[in-house]
Amino acid sequence: RCMMDLATIGAKELKKQGILKNLDESDEINACTVKIKCDVNGKDEDWLFLFKNETHNHPTEIEPFGGAATCIGGAIRDPLSGRSYVYQAMRVTGAGDPLKPVSETLPGKLPQRKLVTTAAAGYSSYGNQIGLATGQVDEIYHPGYVAKRMEIGAVVGATPASHVRRECPAPGDVIVLLGGRTGRDGVGGATGSSKAHKLDSLEHCGAEVQKGNAPIERKLQRLFRREDACRM
């Protein structure tokens, strides 16, 4: 019925057949999580292995630096919320021909060369600041990406299973918010990719793209490596 069904149908079928036995499931899962054995100084330990990807096609099309930066930042956020340390990433993007003259740019669009170079700068800026190794970078050039750019960031994280405490939320629970300061940037961004756009969207929708804060997320990554912090 939707793209999410296509993304999850394989795991559902494997689970139905009883083949997928190491899947970690709970009410809070925000990233694909599997149970693994990890060799730590010659001793097997129970760990959780987390995968997550995020697409920022629309934000990067509108504001390429911030869109690509928060693509990787948002992908990191989800395994991080599972108390894991994200240690590697992959970037796969799609664009039109960046060598075409700027004069051939479609009305209401940024030139492909601008999208390609500025998005690359945004992704690398965030990745370098947070200290994340991106082992695979691949950009696909095809006319089909002229109408809408493709921007995908994928990450892998891991954490000792003993660092994760599973509980269900209940009335009266105290909620602690962690992260950088927020402003009015990003308001409307969640629905921006689903609404109809006009020729002047490029001029008015840039504020819908949130501003990332890699140094703060870097601090959160380090905080959550401490068992006493992530088990609170």
Where are these regions (language model features)?
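Glycine/proline-enriched, intrinsically flexible loops and inter-domain linkers
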Residues: 1-232
